[in-house]
Amino acid sequence: VEFSSLSKTYSMPGWRVGFAVGNKKLIEALTKIKSYLDYGAFTPVQVAAIAALNGSQKCVDDIRSIYLKRRNVLVEGFSRIGWNMDLPKSTMFVWAPLPKKYLNIGSLEFSKLLLENGKVAVAPGIGFGKNGEGFVRIGLVENENRIRQAIKNIKVLFDNDNDNDDDKNKD
């Protein structure tokens, strides 16, 4: 059985609409279980989902192109400020390793640091399980100009931390 959501593909996050395909008997069992849980999605949401699935798929290509541009702005900008990472293949998220300098504080503290001192919100990798430690997840939900501003804010944070390190080394 495969499950799919319309959340990211059709920009319908939070609408809680998706589908399952697979073995007929398993799908029938799932349908029965689902019928005990609720009475289905709100009708306008179902109509919108039908329109998305049956309509032109150009919007999917358009959305993919937007995320690609945002990803490139983010990853290239991070590279310029010394935060290097592999280029994600195709997603609305960047799963970024912590910069080496911040590995010792972990993803949660690094995320707090970015929020408090850089005014940039990311999701700490530890929130996705123990194997997520050492990473942050960055949603490509802002436009390119906002992403560039976030990079500038993070650069200021990194530069200030480097200045503080230099001061400590002088003592």
Where are these regions (language model features)?
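PLP-dependent class I/II
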Residues: 1-171
